Regions:
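Tubulin/FtsZ superfamily GTPase core signature
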Residues: 1-185
Length: 185
């Protein structure tokens, strides 16, 4: 709630240049955005940030676990180095609601960023052993169709037993606006 705490907000803003200079990627999470997300997802405040855990877990497991189509740190670096800001998106649901999964992902950025002009996209689609090429293709095509027509897309896919009947999309989109190219938020 920085609006009520201008000094705290100023200190936070002043710290970002040092963070950018001393890190490869900086993840910025807005309390206002968390509040908005909990309202949009119809969750109480205590549970409203649970999707961040899903987002981080999806990002880390994409990098650490072997998939059918693997994404790695170099792929991640390639995408986040596009000039502009970047954000992480996550959406999940059952295999019968593929459009809803994409819609949920597009409503999940950590900051209020418009992703339609994204120049880079690192997208991981995870499903159970029942996930088909149709599921992978449908989710990916619908998601990517909303980005810049020249967007560089790197696709990963993984199957895991705990995702039976479900699909999860974790994406990093970059090249948004014209600010620091290392901000994910």
């Amino acid at each position: 709630p920085f609006a009520e705490q201008p000094i705290r907000y100023q200190l936070a803003e002043e710290s970002f240049p040092d963070l950018y200079e001393n890190s490869n990627v900086c993840i910025k999470v807005s309390l206002e955005r968390l509040s908005w997300q909990s309202k949009e997802r119809k969750l109480d405040w205590k549970k409203g940030a649970g999707w961040i855990e899903e987002l981080v877990e999806g990002l880390l497991s994409t990098l650490a676990k072997v998939g059918k189509i693997n994404l790695d740190l170099m792929d991640f670096k390639t995408i986040v180095e596009h000039p502009g800001e970047a954000t992480i998106l996550v959406g999940s649901g059952d295999t019968n609601s593929l459009s809803e999964i994409v819609k949920t992902a597009l409503q999940s950025p950590l900051s209020n960023l418009e992703v339609s002009g994204a120049k880079g996209c690192w997208i991981q689609v995870e499903g159970g052993p029942d996930m088909t090429i149709y599921h992978l293709n449908s989710v990916t095509e619908e998601f990517v169709s909303l980005l810049d027509s020249d967007c560089q897309v790197l696709l990963g896919a993984r199957s895991s037993d705990e995702m039976i009947g479900r699909i999860r999309v974790v994406a990093v989109v970059s090249g948004l606006r014209t600010s620091s190219n290392r901000l994910i938020g």
